[in-house]
Amino acid sequence: MALFLQQVLNGLTLGGIYSLVALGLTLVYGILHVPNFAHGAFYMAGAFVAFHLMSAWGANYWIAMAGAALAVAALATLAERLVFNPLRNASGLHPMIAAIGVLLFLEAAAQAIWGADFHRMRSPYTGIVNLAGVTAPVQRLLIIAAAFGLMLALHLFLKRTVTGSTIIAMAQNREGASLVGIDANRVSMLTFAISGVLAAVAATLYAPINLVYPAMGHLVITKAFVIIILGGMGSVPGAIVGGLIIGFAESFGAFYISTDYKDIIAFGLLVLILSLRPQGIFTRGVR
């Protein structure tokens, strides 16, 4: 039983991180209807900014996380203004190519600044908690609490605030929202900023139990795409549920089958679920 609960803990940890990254990706897709491949680079940038603030400037963990969130929010907003907004009326292929260009540029910039080596981010929470025979590192408990707290905050923001309602309206019908006076440019910038914050927080939470390096966003963004396809493109509940499904599947698959197949499980689930429900678990649309 303890081993089973240990995998539940690991699944919640992975699922929380995957869901945060997928939420930012699905929000942007809901507004632009274009897969933002640069989102993986925003994740990587968040980890490097937090790492730099802690290692070079001596900032504590939470200040580094806040600094990374602000920096990546600004970076994502800048990318929206300079890259995605001018291509708003272009065919779907052009924004996709532009997003890949942003991804490659940011990875090259990170490698030029911090090098291609792997870096370890220290965590102030190195303790271990024993819960009913389950070994629970404090950092993993922090990831679970912070990730689900942030998901709840995003849900309340989208459902209970006027600004959040404008994001939902823009995702459902951009032309109609513009006709009733919603500023499309402002909503797009805000959505990119939120996606940047989610990516940076996810990276800063996960980096202490992983490694920081320029290509760290590749596998994460690939799985995030699997998640939003599983959950339904543009669906916020789908991103959360899909992230948890992939997190639990990887955790239990690695333990009961083999760690060699851990990363393949997500793609196997994608094929299985889409063969049964091609539209994904939830229907399209941010809500």
Question: What does each model-found stretch correspond to?
Answer:
Residues 82, 113, 172-179, 183-186, ...:
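Cytosolic-side transmembrane-helix boundaries in multi-pass membrane proteins
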Residues 28-78, 82:
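Membrane-embedded helix boundary and interhelical linker motif in transport proteins
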Residues 47-51, 69-75, 102-110, 146-155, ...:
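Hydrophobic core segments of alpha-helical transmembrane domains in multi-pass membrane transport
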Residues 14, 135-212, 236-242:
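Helix-loop-helix "hairpin" substructures at the membrane interface of multi-pass membrane proteins
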